[in-house]
Amino acid sequence: MTVKTPVYLDYAATTPVDKRVAEKMIPYLTETFGNPASNSHAFGWEAEEAVEKARADIAALINADPKEIVFTSGATESDNLAIKGAANFYKTKGKHLITVKTEHKAVLDTMRELERQGFEVTYLGVQENGLIDLEELKAAIRDDTILISVMWVNNEIGVVQDIPAIGEICRERKIVFHVDAAQACGKVPVDVEAAKIDLLSMSAHKVYGPKGIGALYVRRKPRVRLEAQMHGGGHERGFRSGTLPTHQIVGMGEAFRIAKEELEQDMAHYRKLRDIFLKGIEGIEEVYVNGDLEHRAPNNLNVSFNFVEGESLIMAVKELAVSSGSACTSASLEPSYVLRALGRNDELAHSSLRITFGRMTTEEEVQFAAELIKSKIGKLRELSPLWEMFKDGIDLNSIEWAAH
């Protein structure tokens, strides 16, 4: 069988909308177009009914009450609403927040903004495997700590933090616990009750739903309070004003309904693809998987190939849509801050590829990707004087390079 290229292996960036989801959305664009807040006629009632059905489907995936789901424009807005909203509401109790150095920018930049407003933030480091040390977390907690934010699944390296254990610590100390679950929903089981989570951010477009829609779970018992960040008509119980986009909400609801129904088979599919890929690149020397392989979402692999420059590798495998672990925008050639936090050196951080599988990925595509990467790595290393020196047994760290 011939594989159609380019092969999409960047499902952590975004996913295609599942055809079943797209079909469900279409009527809400043209026929059932009412405003869900219009409560004086059938157009509004029908739209509201569709929104509430979606709310229930989203709640079901994470074991929440539908009343605890607040619609937003995506996980970035959910992170902002959760962190700024809780910090500002509880600031009379204290102004200390805790998060992790490997969080998504939506959390880190929000924390930085709060620092500018006078809050104090502790950024926890991670161990070599990408997981935080729970003892270190406990030691960082102070009497004035009001919020802890830890992501469930890391977007770059896919590692799964011990969220239930952190939830236990927070509940014991009466600290608000926020979790960014954009990469977790539909990839690993998520249960806000079992994990004692207070605030949880979700996104539709990582789960085969449309872009531009997300949700924030806000616990009711024990009740968590937030200060709204968007003011207007008081929609979403006052947490988030703005007309609800019925078609997008219906899409998110259907995507989450399917994700709950097919979670087991999706996870088994991802595991199988991951094993095929790892077997396919087995023979390559100096290959490092970034992040813990056990505590990891099954659809994510982040691999560093020593003595190969990440950018040249991406160009060499142009038949694959993958992302480089480094921020390979032309303006920023900084290596990935997540990989640096694992203690990877600049060379390894620069030579990484993030390969993420999805529901639509086939075994043939993964086989093709592994073989292609294997052959290109060989070719790129043949061009590398560093590889030659390494093969000759020269310790590259001991060399004094001439300055220009």
From Swiss-Prot:
Report quaternary structure and partners.
Homodimer. Forms a heterotetramer with IscU, interacts with other sulfur acceptors.
Cofactor needs: pyridoxal 5'-phosphate
Principal subcellular localization: cytoplasm
Underlying gene = iscS
Q: Where in the cell is it found?
A: Cytoplasm
Q: Which Pfam families match?
A: Aminotran_5 (PF00266)
Report the function annotation for this chain.
Master enzyme that delivers sulfur to a number of partners involved in Fe-S cluster assembly, tRNA modification or cofactor biosynthesis. Catalyzes the removal of elemental sulfur atoms from cysteine to produce alanine. Functions as a sulfur delivery protein for Fe-S cluster synthesis onto IscU, an Fe-S scaffold assembly protein, as well as other S acceptor proteins.
Q: In which pathway does it act?
A: Cofactor biosynthesis; iron-sulfur cluster biosynthesis
User: At what positions is N6-(pyridoxal phosphate)lysine found?
Assistant: K206
**Residues at the catalytic site:** C328
| Alphabetized UniProt keyword annotations | 2Fe-2S, Cytoplasm, Iron, Iron-sulfur, Metal-binding, Pyridoxal phosphate, Transferase
E.C. number(s) listed in UniProt: 2.8.1.7
GO annotations under biological process? [2Fe-2S] cluster assembly
Q: Which PANTHER family match?
A: CYSTEINE DESULFURASE (PTHR11601:SF34), CYSTEINE DESULFURYLASE FAMILY MEMBER (PTHR11601)
Which residues bind [2Fe-2S] cluster per the record? C328
What's this protein's name? Answer: Cysteine desulfurase IscS
Positions that bind pyridoxal 5'-phosphate: A75, T76, N155, Q183, S203, A204, H205, T243
A GO cellular component entry from the record: L-cysteine desulfurase complex
The answer to whether UniProt assigns keyword Metal-binding to this entry is yes
**Gene3D superfamilies, per this entry?**
Aspartate Aminotransferase, domain 1, Type I PLP-dependent aspartate aminotransferase-like (Major domain)
The UniProt catalytic activity note for this protein reads: (sulfur carrier)-H + L-cysteine = (sulfur carrier)-SH + L-alanine
GO MF: 2 iron, 2 sulfur cluster binding; cysteine desulfurase activity; metal ion binding; pyridoxal phosphate binding
Would you identify the family this protein belongs to, as annotated? Belongs to the class-V pyridoxal-phosphate-dependent aminotransferase family. NifS/IscS subfamily.
